[in-house]
Amino acid sequence: MEKLRMNVQGRVQGVGFRYMTKMVADQLGVTGSVRNEDDGSVSITAIAPEDIMETFIKKIKDSPSPAGRVTYVDIQEDPLLEETEQFKVIQ
């Protein structure tokens, strides 16, 4: 299992990015969370097998929201990330 933290920058707030990210995660079976940050970026924690994670990252980089636009994604491994049963949107 890969355990990653991502910080996504671009037009990612106010465009349905978090909810579309959850939809993609649910379709792929990725668990974790997504939340808006004060600096206008979005933070994602994600846990999935490597092949599924590759697909998830590609979809995030392409922006799951049609109105969104991703300009940069910082990805860090975090082996201490706690596993969850679902993917949730944090308000």
Curated annotation (Swiss-Prot):
InterPro entries for this protein: Acylphosphatase, Acylphosphatase-like_dom, Acylphosphatase-like_dom_sf, Acylphosphatase_CS
UniProt GO MF annotations: acylphosphatase activity
A Pfam family matched in the record: Acylphosphatase
PROSITE patterns with a match to the protein in the record: ACYLPHOSPHATASE_1, ACYLPHOSPHATASE_3
Record EC number: 3.6.1.7
Keywords carried by this UniProt record: Hydrolase
Keyword Repeat carried by entry: no
Active-site residues annotated for this sequence: 18, 36
Domain Acylphosphatase-like residues, every copy: 3-91
Catalytic activity: an acyl phosphate + H2O = a carboxylate + phosphate + H(+)
Family as reported in the entry's similarity comment: Belongs to the acylphosphatase family.
PANTHER family in the record: ACYLPHOSPHATASE
Protein name: Acylphosphatase
Gene: acyP
